[in-house]
Amino acid sequence: IMPVYPKIPHRDYRTTFELLTKIYKRLLTKIDKPENLVIIGDSAGGQIALAFAQMLKKEQLSQPGHIVLISPVLDATFKNPESRKYEKEDPMLGIDGSKYLVELWAGDTPLDDYKMSPMNGDLEGLGHITLTVGTKETLYPDAVKFSHMLNDKGIKHQFIPGYNLFHIYPLFPIPERQRFLEQLKKIIVTKEL
């Protein structure tokens, strides 16, 4: 299932989370094992995927077995000073433009709230996390920080840096895409990190 979620400027995250919650609850009635569900999100969708999994936990709904984050926005405040250094090499994302869009998405919700900055949320008890991000993108420093946070908390995850690659590189028809997809398939099928 690939939901087309409501977007800014006409809607904010609340409408999207309501839609995703309805879809997810319906899915839970149709499957035997929630651990067979995989949530995948790229860019803002990666932010949504992780924040949504955290919301599911708060609502005491079953976790998906796997959460795949492709170049996710993990900290919508964009306060990491390292990000500015990477911004110079990022052909797709600028911090100021990204922050403006996140502010529209957030509405009156603070940018450091886990729904906007999921690395600030409760990371315990979520589905297995696989994270990939290009090393030439603005979001790379936060992805490294997030991976270290997960390591420090003893949370199993897979971090797959896309060396010398750009934002959402697995969506482009390049050889690195195929390598990532093969790794991802192995991780999801074997359930080993």
Residue ranges and their predicted role:
Residues I1-L193:
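Alpha/beta-hydrolase superfamily serine-hydrolase fold, recognizing
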